[in-house]
């Protein structure tokens, strides 16, 4: 049967159209693959025949306010293998095992593993530079040594709870290392090299290098000189009193900058695994909460002065040794009471019944308003992990007894950093600041500041006039009251003692107290606030004025000159008791002869250096006040040499 020409033409047209459609589909698909998916497919192809050797970034360094390095990095390379490139697995395993001090069997599992790239762990991670050089010298095919680092803390336990520590992957795990991990960690880089189907490196292909981006350096508000002084004083107190724990915080009251922070027990960040986790997990100055005791009376005093409920010099109070409140007898620490006092003396003597009276004058609404305005019952916002909030009575549950005990610092729970921030506000003119410890972030390459933290003023709590009265009252506490052991000649230290019974299972413990002192200086223009608390000191009377006040005094005495604070005049003279060591003024002995000293320095010990009888130099300088019995050093020369020098 013959097919007509028309039918043939129709069939040819159909085949042609079908071919065109198929061609268009294929062409469209090819175009889509080439132009739309091309980049993605190329990347996938490269990934299938490329290997990435990671390059770790340098973690940002942590510096004190003066540039002293507190946390740095040490080179610690890491060993990788590309199993397909290993030509002799047995030989490679034997040589690597010898250098890395591991079994040949374990290395063999790594070098023969079905993986594109394999890290030898843990023995091959963070190795010494000496071992890295040995491995490179072996020139083993498929074995690579990549640059890496470990965190280094050059001063050991110095500032340990604040700094925290980083893990083996240089990730922040605790403290500032964790809080600012995103800024410090940087971004990883790599070297990408290409391999053939057998995994062998292709020598004609250039490697792709993506450099790591190092983390930002971080400068703190901490002054390492102040921190060193605090650490020294805590070490001395620990050796003397064997306490259950200790806390110290130093802050600039004018802006909230933390100048130092320490606690005991402490730990070495590079060896944190050697101590119980409870030691490093608890940064006591921000985490711990306890009854503040008499240091809290500063808040009650501030509220009463601001509300004009008391005149320190005119108003009087008779202390019979206790106060009766709603059937409860609240005792003063002094048996038999202080008798008739002005309210300035109530503050100096830390008289509990006197502060119960101030609480009654204020009423619970006003008292608790100021307590909350000073930041208690809420986090301060300091840039450290694990900050506590403390515990306050709900206002609806505050009866006469709760109001009375709160007024002298019992029955409430606060953190040390809350107390430091609140007292700073009380003495700085009335402004409550957020404490902070990270000051600025610096590009490690350009050394330029990338960002900076500014002081945050939360609120004006009291007036400058009220703050002035508080400073005067607290300076008198140190000169004439319970804080005399914190007195520093020439620096006008003010402050308040605290002695609080510890609570366990809802009951107060006997002979187990947290004793504290919070001080500031100079009283005319405070530049430094220091808080010290000692938990259950042994072998001593457990009073804040006996144990904590001398520690704060020593910290103040050495820190203020380091901060550039000049000695002051118009200091309230210290009121001495029978057992106090008096201070005397060093006379000018330069130009005198040795024979003149016998009658002049009857209250001082003399240490002479040099030969001759004429004094050409002395230390300390004339006019300096020192404790009776202190040593004065004089430098001698022959009389004719002195005349020749003149």
From Swiss-Prot:
Gene behind this protein? spoVD
One of this protein's GO BP terms?
peptidoglycan biosynthetic process
| GO molecular-function terms, A-Z | penicillin binding; serine-type D-Ala-D-Ala carboxypeptidase activity
Taxonomic source organism: Bacillus subtilis (strain 168)
User: Phenotype when inactivated?
Assistant: Asporogeneous; spore development starts but does not develop the spore cortex.
Xref: Gene3D superfamilies: 3.30.10.20, 3.30.450.330, DD-peptidase/beta-lactamase superfamily, Penicillin-binding protein 2a (Domain 2)
Enzyme Commission number(s) = 3.4.16.4
Name the InterPro entries on file.
Bact_Transpept/Beta-Lactamase (IPR050515), Beta-lactam/transpept-like (IPR012338), PASTA_dom (IPR005543), PBP_dimer (IPR005311), PBP_dimer_sf (IPR036138), PCN-bd_Tpept (IPR001460), SpoVD_pbp (IPR011927)
Q: Does the keyword Protease apply?
A: yes
Q: Which domain of life is it from?
A: Bacteria
Name listed for the protein in its UniProt record: Stage V sporulation protein D
The record's top EC class is hydrolase
Cellular component annotations (GO), alphabetically ordered: plasma membrane
List UniProt keywords, sorted A-Z: Carboxypeptidase, Cell membrane, Cell shape, Cell wall biogenesis/degradation, Hydrolase, Membrane, Peptidoglycan synthesis, Protease, Sporulation
């Amino acid at each position: 049967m013959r097919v007509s020409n028309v039918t043939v033409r129709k069939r040819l047209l159909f085949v042609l159209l079908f071919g065109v459609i198929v061609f268009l589909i294929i062409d469209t698909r090819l175009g889509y693959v080439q132009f739309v998916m091309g980049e993605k497919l190329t990347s996938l192809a490269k990934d299938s025949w490329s290997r990435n050797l990671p390059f770790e970034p340098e973690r940002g360094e942590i510096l004190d306010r003066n540039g002293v390095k507190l946390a740095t990095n040490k080179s610690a390379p890491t060993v990788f293998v590309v199993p397909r490139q290993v030509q002799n697995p047995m030989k490679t395993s034997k040589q690597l095992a010898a250098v890395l001090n591991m079994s040949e069997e374990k290395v063999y599992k790594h070098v023969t593993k079905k993986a594109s790239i394999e890290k030898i762990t843990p023995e091959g991670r963070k190795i010494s530079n000496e071992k890295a050089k040995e491995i490179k010298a072996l020139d083993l095919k498929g074995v690579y040594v990549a640059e890496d680092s470990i965190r280094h803390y050059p001063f050991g336990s110095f500032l340990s709870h604040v700094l925290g520590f980083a893990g083996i992957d240089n990730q922040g795990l605790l403290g500032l290392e964790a809080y600012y991990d995103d800024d410090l960690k940087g971004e990883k880089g790599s070297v990408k090299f290409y391999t053939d189907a057998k995994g062998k490196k292709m020598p004609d292909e250039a490697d792709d290098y993506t450099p790591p981006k190092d983390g930002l350096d971080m400068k703190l508000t901490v002054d390492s000189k102040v921190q060193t002084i605090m650490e020294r004083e805590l070490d001395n107190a620990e050796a003397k009193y064997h306490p259950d724990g200790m806390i110290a915080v130093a802050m600039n009251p004018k802006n909230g900058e933390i100048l130092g922070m320490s606690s005991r027990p402490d730990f070495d960040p590079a060896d944190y695994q050697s101590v119980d986790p409870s030691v490093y997990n608890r940064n006591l100055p921000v985490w711990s909460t306890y009854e503040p005791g008499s240091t809290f009376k500063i808040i009650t005093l501030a509220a009463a002065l601001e509300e004009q409920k008391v005149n320190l010099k005119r108003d009087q109070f008779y202390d019979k040794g206790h106060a009766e409140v709603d059937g409860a007898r609240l005792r003063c620490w002094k048996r038999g009471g202080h008798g008739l006092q002005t309210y300035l003396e109530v503050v100096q003597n830390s008289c509990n019944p006197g502060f119960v009276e101030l609480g009654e004058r204020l009423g619970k609404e006003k008292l608790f308003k100021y307590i909350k305005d000073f930041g208690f019952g809420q986090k301060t916002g300091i840039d450290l992990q694990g900050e506590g909030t403390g515990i306050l009575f709900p206002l609806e549950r505050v009866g006469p007894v709760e109001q009375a005990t709160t007024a002298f610092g019992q029955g409430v729970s606060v953190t040390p950093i809350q107390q430091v921030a609140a007292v700073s506000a009380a003495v700085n003119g009335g402004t409550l600041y957020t404490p902070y410890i990270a000051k600025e972030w610096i590009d490690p390459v350009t050394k330029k500041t990338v960002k900076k933290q500014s002081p945050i003023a939360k609120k004006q709590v009291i007036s400058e006039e009220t703050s002035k009265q508080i400073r005067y009252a607290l300076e008198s506490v140190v000169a004439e009251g319970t804080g005399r052991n914190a007195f520093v000649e020439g620096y006008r230290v003010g402050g308040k003692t605290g002695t609080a019974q510890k609570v366990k299972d809802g009951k107060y413990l006997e002979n187990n107290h947290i004793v504290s002192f919070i001080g500031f200086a100079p009283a005319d223009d405070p530049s430094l606030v220091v808080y010290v608390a000692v938990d259950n000191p042994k072998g001593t009377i457990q009073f804040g004025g006996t144990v904590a006040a001398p520690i704060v005094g020593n910290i103040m005495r050495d820190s203020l000159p380091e901060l550039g604070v000049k000695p002051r005049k118009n200091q309230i003279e210290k009121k001495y008791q029978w057992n106090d060591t008096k201070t005397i003024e060093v006379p000018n002995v330069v130009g005198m002869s040795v024979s003149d000293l016998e009658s002049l320095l009857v209250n001082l010990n003399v240490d002479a250096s040099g030969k001759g009888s004429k004094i050409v130099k002395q230390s300390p300088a004339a006019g300096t006040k020192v404790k009776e019995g202190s040593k004065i050093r004089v430098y001698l020369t022959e009389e004719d040499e002195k005349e020749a020098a003149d």
